[in-house]
Structure formats: structure tokens, C-alpha cells
């Protein structure tokens, strides 16, 4: 009889404050955090959404005209994939021997994208994807990902690693396609999102809270029978003015973090206070996913593809096509 072999992996979820609108400072902080997880022997680490150069809450709290100088600064402090800054991060990943999923605001030519790169232990970018649909007013500042960004899972020595950004987790079909890609460990990259004080009530939507976002991530762990690393930003009160949130009623003090690690049954493995910076660690057995799948496999034995199926277009759209040379 063949006994199952444990597949032990040490995972890490970042909860940290960005270096707001500071590309070099953000790169330095990522490198420092990679050093921390390397010392702790982490095999896989996830970072929050647009950790470089931070999530610009001012897009919600200021008019586009009032916010224009801030976003011009934001553009120039966003990170290009093909850049010396990214190569510094890749070198740090290699030095610390961890597989990294990094969330960042990507600058490409004249546009921005909400992006993730998957960097292996050799420091190579093995996948680069963009948020397929920026949320609400985000669409005024960031472009959309194309069909190639539907791929959100890559292989690694530590299992199959996946990742999505923020409200991509609300997209049932996108989640389903990730499950079909056989994800083992999923990085849920989120910005800073505060919970709603009782005194505010319905004046602030519950669906834009850390609590709701955490629940979405937990559902993905259960639904996809995978480990989920919830990685979030925090914002200190001293940075409220820079981010134009000082007068937002429900934002009360340093906080906005909700990092967590969930197991493939949806069970919480590790959590952290919302106002603290830190790194969550857990030693997990990737085979726990297979034990959970005995009960639930929504792309396998617990599916009905003869009744319900998903059509996927993974081909990237291009703004320019070249005609073939005419025959002479």
C-alpha cells in the first residue's frame, strides 16, 4: 500500500504599509521584507495589491482635477517590469530562496496596470499578469488585463501557485478558471480596507470593508480547496493627509489590514490585528488540498459540465495589427 507523502511548505503573507508614492523606497521595503521571510525559511511569500507605490485612496476621496498632481506623481513612481528596480527585486528573491508573488502598479509606456509578477527561487519572472477589470473609479487610472492574464497559476517546487488582485475575487468565472488550473496555494492581493464602525452604519458600503474582503478570500479557500494567503496593506494615521483620507468618516486611526492564511477547508490558520505591520507564517501540507477535494471538487467530481461549462479566451488583444505583405 502506498502511503501519502507529506508536502510540507512554509508560506508567508505580508501585512505592511507601503512607502507611499516612492518607487525607490517601495523597492527597498520589498527587499527588506524578502530578507525577513528568507531568514524565517519561507518557501512562498505573497504581497498586497499595488504594494509599490501603495493603493491611492485619493481616487475615491478627491475629484479627478484635485487629485491630478497626486496621480501624476503616482505614475512616475509606479514600477516597470523591465527595469533596474524590478531586477533588484528579482535578485533579492533569488538571494532569499523564496517563491514570490508581488503586487504592484505597473507602468508600461503611457499607461498603468494593476499587476502581479510571479518570481521563482532563481529570480526569474515566470509569469506576469494584469487585473482583468479594474474596479469602479480605478478604471480612470489603470488599464485592463487581456486574455493572457486569465492564466493565474504557475508550477513551482512548492506546488501550483496562483494569484488574483482585490475584487477579481468577486468574479465567479475567473475563480472557477483558476480552480481548473489546479491551484494549490493562492495569493489574494488586497489594498488597505478598513472595517465599518457601528457609528457609521450604512453611510459606508459594507462591501468595501476588510471584513467582507476577508470573507471573499475565505470562500475561495473552501470553494477552490486551496490554501489562501491574504496579503494586505495598512495605513498609518500620519499618512492620512498624503492619501487624502483624513475626513473620511469610517477611517478611524491606523489600520486597514486583514491579512490571514486559510486552509483548503476554509479554516483560519493565522490572522493578524488590523493596525499592525508584520508577516504571517504557516507550515502547511499541500496534500491537505487533496483531502478536502474528496468532499468538494467543483471542477471535477462535484461538477456537471454537461449542464454548465465555461468558455475562456486566453488570447491577448492588440491595439495594432500588421497586414500581410500583398502578393506580387
UniProtKB/Swiss-Prot annotation:
It is an enzyme of class 3 (hydrolase). Keywords: Hydrolase. Its EC number is 3.5.5.1. GO terms for molecular function: hydro-lyase activity; nitrilase activity. Residues 9-286 form the CN hydrolase domain. SUPFAM superfamilies: Carbon-nitrogen hydrolase (SSF56317). The active site is at residues 49, 131, 166. It catalyses: a nitrile + 2 H2O = a carboxylate + NH4(+). Nitrilase that hydrolyzes preferentially 4-cyanopyridine. Is also able to hydrolyze some aliphatic nitriles, such as (R,S)-mandelonitrile. Belongs to the carbon-nitrogen hydrolase superfamily. Nitrilase family. PANTHER family: ARYLACETONITRILASE, NITRILASE. This is Nitrilase. It comes from Penicillium rubens (strain ATCC 28089 / DSM 1075 / NRRL 1951 / Wisconsin 54-1255).
